[in-house]
A protein has these predicted regions:
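Short acidic-hydrophobic, aromatic-tinged amphipathic segments that line or gate anion-handling sites
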Residues: 79, 137-140, 233
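Structural element of the ATP-grasp superfamily
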Residues: 64-68, 106, 131, 189, ...
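Amphipathic coiled-coil/heptad-repeat helices and related helical stalk/stem segments
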Residues: 78, 99, 123, 150-151, ...
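Catalytic core of membrane glycerolipid acyltransferases/transacylases, capturing the structured
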Residues: 38-58, 87-144
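Non-catalytic C-terminal accessory region of glycerolipid acyltransferases
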Residues: 2-5, 148-272
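Membrane-anchoring hydrophobic helices of lipid-metabolizing enzymes
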Residues: 2-91
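Juxtamembrane loop-helix boundary motifs flanking transmembrane segments in multi-pass membrane proteins
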Residues: 5-13, 139, 146, 242
Length: 272
């Protein structure tokens, strides 16, 4: 590979540094410019909420689908099933989680969608502001009171006609093997009677993941995003049964995508 190609490491570092810097700069400008809007629209909370959602969705869509690919950080080679599931709003989207880019990429595709985040993120000043003015829900899965309060807030978001995005693994995976699912999203689906839409987000190389070399990955990183058929809760299901059905479906979808990549691992029993 030539010195101007993907394999020239200084060039790779430069491209990714520009990408990271532009993200943090744009996010800071967005938040700073948003403050006057929040103040001006305080008497009109519904208008404020809608405007912020539209602007943030447009920003994330441009950043993840146009700007970062233009820098050569990755290519999105496949997005399937999105048009079929968008009319189902409100719905609960559950996605596998391997890198920090997962959430903003999906939020750039899904308008009017809240997201569940860890409580430790919610304590950070920036996230605290986002939680107040956007549909971010902070939860501590180890605290019953936090889970109960978060379930209630999620139900309000869904009853308002908005989607919810959840990463049921809870944290970024260290391999291609799906981690055990937390039951929060599936308990919520049972209570609200709403479909669960499994989402696969797959990259040929790790990017901002819990793997060495993922900060400056070298090579042609191809992203595939698949929105699978909705899984509807039934009266016979409990949250565990619903979780298991979704887990198996996602694991089957990931297995051929992972084959021959760094994510390729021996499948757990639940693949079968």
């Amino acid at each position: 590979m030539t010195a101007t190609g993907q394999g020239f490491f200084p060039f790779t570092v430069f491209r990714f540094t520009v990408g990271y810097a532009s993200y943090f700069l744009a996010k800071s400008v967005f938040l700073v410019c948003g403050l006057p809007v929040l103040i001006l629209l305080t008497p009109f909370p519904s208008t404020k909420q809608l405007l912020l959602q539209v602007l943030s969705h447009a920003f994330l869509r441009f950043f993840t689908r146009t700007w970062l690919p233009a820098l050569g950080l990755y290519r999105i080679v496949e997005i399937t099933g999105l048009d079929q599931v968008l009319p189902l709003r409100p719905a609960i989207y559950v996605a596998n989680h391997r890198g920090y880019l997962d959430s903003i990429t999906l939020l750039g595709l899904l308008p009017r969608t809240g997201v569940l985040i860890k409580s430790r993120h919610g304590r950070q000043p920036m996230y605290h502001m986002l939680i107040r003015h956007f549909n971010l829900v902070s939860v501590d899965p180890n605290a019953l009171s936090s889970v109960s309060a978060s379930l209630e807030r999620c139900e309000r978001i869904l009853s308002g006609g908005e989607n919810l995005l959840v990463f049921p693994e809870g944290s970024r995976a260290r391999s291609g093997r799906l981690q055990r699912f937390n039951g929060f999203a599936f308990e919520l689906a049972q209570r609200a009677g709403l479909p669960v839409i499994p989402v696969i987000i797959h990259s040929t190389l790790p990017f901002m993941a819990k793997l060495p070399g993922s900060i400056f990955p070298r090579g042609d990183n191809q992203y595939r995003i698949r929105f699978l058929d909705p899984v509807h809760p039934t009266p016979e299901d409990d949250a565990d049964a619903l979780s298991d059905r979704v887990y198996r479906r996602m694991a089957r979808e990931l297995r051929p995508l992972d084959a021959g990549t760094i994510w390729d691992t021996e499948p757990p029993a639940r693949y079968d």
